[in-house]
Amino acid sequence: MRRFKRKHLTAIDCQHLARSHLAVTQPFGQRWTNRDPNHGLYPKPRTKRGSRGQGSQRCIPEFFLAGKQPCTNDMAKSNSVGQDSCQDSEGDMIFPAESSCALPQEGSAGPGSPGSAPPSRKRSWSSEEESNQATGTSRWDGVSKKAPRHHLSVPCTRPREARQEAEDSTSRLSAESGETDQDAGDVGPDPIPDSYYGLLGTLPCQEALSHICSLPSEVLRHVFAFLPVEDLYWNLSLVCHLWREIISDPLFIPWKKLYHRYLMNEEQAVSKVDGILSNCGIEKESDLCVLNLIRYTATTKCSPSVDPERVLWSLRDHPLLPEAEACVRQHLPDLYAAAGGVNIWALVAAVVLLSSSVNDIQRLLFCLRRPSSTVTMPDVTETLYCIAVLLYAMREKGINISNRIHYNIFYCLYLQENSCTQATKVKEEPSVWPGKKTIQLTHEQQLILNHKMEPLQVVKIMAFAGTGKTSTLVKYAEKWSQSRFLYVTFNKSIAKQAERVFPSNVICKTFHSMAYGHIGRKYQSKKKLNLFKLTPFMVNSVLAEGKGGFIRAKLVCKTLENFFASADEELTIDHVPIWCKNSQGQRVMVEQSEKLNGVLEASRLWDNMRKLGECTEEAHQMTHDGYLKLWQLSKPSLASFDAIFVDEAQDCTPAIMNIVLSQPCGKIFVGDPHQQIYTFRGAVNALFTVPHTHVFYLTQSFRFGVEIAYVGATILDVCKRVRKKTLVGGNHQSGIRGDAKGQVALLSRTNANVFDEAVRVTEGEFPSRIHLIGGIKSFGLDRIIDIWILLQPEEERRKQNLVIKDKFIRRWVHKEGFSGFKRYVTAAEDKELEAKIAVVEKYNIRIPELVQRIEKCHIEDLDFAEYILGTVHKAKGLEFDTVHVLDDFVKVPCARHNLPQLPHFRVESFSEDEWNLLYVAVTRAKKRLIMTKSLENILTLAGEYFLQAELTSNVLKTGVVRCCVGQCNNAIPVDTVLTMKKLPITYSNRKENKGGYLCHSCAEQRIGPLAFLTASPEQVRAMERTVENIVLPRHEALLFLVF
């Protein structure tokens, strides 16, 4: 192929080139003389090309081992653009047999091992390179018109390097000055031109380095410092020896490593952190433990190039800088007036400790990223990890420090290391199914998608609320489109919705629908299927003579329920409950004789239920849980699937787990272990009980922002001691202090409270439009009316022609009436009917009018409703912009600093189900959460009182300021530097705490040693200490005495 012709430049062309950026960026391509600085840009007469000479100078430093090339222009002798004075030697190689970027292998010597030959710095001339020259392919600066660009991957071999002629440079100069590059929009990031990153220009013979291994170790360390520790150890350390050495270096991100090792309870890490706390006076007995934390942080080493004045200038816009400066100046003057200027890390630590939200930490990072700042982000990140691990350890040691500070740091660092916004673009996982929306996957989701299921594997995905577990399964099924999957869940509506979003290689079913197809259909064809659950009323009618009664019938029902939920093949005495309620409503232990009678009656009842013949007794009909049990006992085979997805795995019963685990294919259990709210149905948490081969976590919620995420994480932290994995949200705004806007969801624990709220919001001249979750029919307003009719005297029923529609309730008209019905409900422990009876007794004669009003205000489309009402059980899986948590959940009676007045209260006294219900309610919110006073009290158990620091000089501008605590008479002292202010908050009962300034004594009672950032211990101790009087509602006081 012919070589391209040189372009002859006119004088005008030379003037354009002299003014272009190429004259600056390519200084080696210009002739510099004393007379004419643009002399090298003039046209050069065509001369005969001479033979190439052997060049000896090499211009790339030694640390660019993999990319070293022979220089083709001796700059000391000639800097002419059109000459090439270097020649390659035949047979020389550019790569050594084993380089520092080779993959680690067992038994292989390291890069510095004895006997390893020094790497050759030459290369051989290849026919491919000669072809590139012949075709005019330009690879200057790494941009090739003929071949695709490199990708940021780590291959074991390097791409062959092309040789560049001097004519290529001249050709490109003319093309860039007068022509538009058509491929400009398609090229990727520019490769590295040389070891000086092109700042000194590039030579015509020199090819740009485009391989990540060509980066210096210092640059790699800087890049790796931004990655999660899990990625560094599980993935990057396996790439090559060089990367492993960088990651294993004890001087590389030491605090980040120590933080994660401490969370894992590694013995050496715990010992090291404990030693730091002890040696630096960061102990529970020390009033100055927080100030000592700042002092220790100030010892953090930083680069010699750090200019404190420039860093301070970068922080000038941070809202907490004046408070931080005042704190350090007053309490740590030696760090503020140091010889080299103010200690920057002391100011950073003070800002972090005074921060009241994640926004304060994010603003701090933003300021320190400014070009005017001389600190590096790895140094800042290391400092934050240092503070984080010490704060975490302080809480472990019982020091009264708020978990909010650690949460703020963790949240920012998590987003920095895992958020998609940290990279220019995160690759979206393409959908192979037409019409499916492409979504961006998080780092945690991508780890799951990369796992290939094998037979008999058991994978657990522990997913917090709103973390996209369903979308993760959808993307998994799309990626592994050649496999067949079975998606199973418990809720029919969820299964229907799954059918619409999953690809065609996934079959979506409920467990009961599969059992119905194999077993239940047979009973339906014989009209022997009970559409409702077995009740003590049904069972009582078939018990043996002399052994009846609703209490014994309840015992038999519970025995059968335990058997249906278990994986056992035979019904035994072990299925009989240990405890029951007697006729006086007291909880007593079941006697052995009652156990034997209970298992005998339950076995007889189960035998009659299994028969396919006709039956006259309602109790002998097969139930849904009954035919599911029969299907489990038949040992079904699901061998046609490659893997089974079990959604909401925390609600699995042992019977269901037995069905799934007995299959030969792979199993994926997905769920949130903290959303287990169906233990009363015999559910056990499969995410804890089932042994696994692999476990993954989804911790970042797409549903809500930081404030709501903090409340959910604190409930798990304080009430369930969950600290190893932390719930985080997104970067969008969310509020928890009572700012309700637009549509509001009112979530309750019981149906009785739902009815109360429906009555309240539909009152007045302009009643609100409401929507009951699950529909008005499922709420049971008809049964409320029937119970009210049952309550009316017989004469009144006849007079008003009142007819009870419900078959079961109608039976009590001719039995014992309303009083007998109520006794039965109490003995049967039927919570649903108990709630309805409570509603009827509370509103009595108003029931018909209230039910009619609720039905009139109810609309089916929730998008047009002003209020959405329902219980947490029905709201599970849903989400709403604003959630209003009602006041019938588990209660913490007072704030932490007043709990010593209630010695009988224990968080551990309540079951996990109660805390799970509250957690589910809170995590339904997307934008705003309206809390109860009890929920705020839970946050105080973690040290969060919604306080923010202000300069005392600003507080006292208007005169004397009193403490906002009602029973406190202290005033804010003038000689203190900072004062804490309680932020206002509106509770779900519409009461408002307007907040205000706290005296330093009251602040110390609430936030402990953090108060000594505002005033000295002597000043705080000199103030009068106020003890608040706690007045509890009578029923709550009795409850705490009982427990």
From Swiss-Prot:
A motif (APIM motif) lies at residues 807-811. GO terms for biological process: DNA catabolic process; DNA damage response; DNA repair; double-strand break repair via homologous recombination; negative regulation of double-strand break repair via homologous recombination; positive regulation of intrinsic apoptotic signaling pathway in response to DNA damage; positive regulation of protein phosphorylation; protein ubiquitination. Residues 158-170 have a biased composition (Basic and acidic residues). InterPro entries: DNA_helicase_UvrD-like_C, DNA_helicase_UvrD/REP, F-box-like_dom_sf, F-box_dom, P-loop_NTPase, UvrD-like_ATP-bd. It catalyses: Couples ATP hydrolysis with the unwinding of duplex DNA by translocating in the 3'-5' direction; ATP + H2O = ADP + phosphate + H(+). Keywords: ATP-binding, Chromosome, DNA damage, DNA repair, DNA-binding, Helicase, Hydrolase, Isomerase, Nucleotide-binding, Nucleus, Phosphoprotein, Ubl conjugation, Ubl conjugation pathway. PROSITE patterns: FBOX (PS50181). Its EC number is 5.6.2.4. ATP binds at residues 463-470. Residues 138-184 form the F-box domain. 3'-5' DNA helicase and substrate-recognition component of the SCF(FBH1) E3 ubiquitin ligase complex that plays a key role in response to stalled/damaged replication forks. Involved in genome maintenance by acting as an anti-recombinogenic helicase and preventing extensive strand exchange during homologous recombination: promotes RAD51 filament dissolution from stalled forks, thereby inhibiting homologous recombination and preventing excessive recombination. Part of the SCF (SKP1-CUL1-F-box) E3 ubiquitin-protein ligase complex SCF(FBH1) composed of CUL1, SKP1, RBX1 and FBH1. Interacts with RAD51. Interacts with RPA2. Interacts (via PIP-box and RanBP2-type zinc finger) with PCNA. Belongs to the helicase family. UvrD subfamily. This is F-box DNA helicase 1. It comes from Homo sapiens (Human). The lineage of its organism: Eukaryota, Metazoa, Chordata, Craniata, Vertebrata.
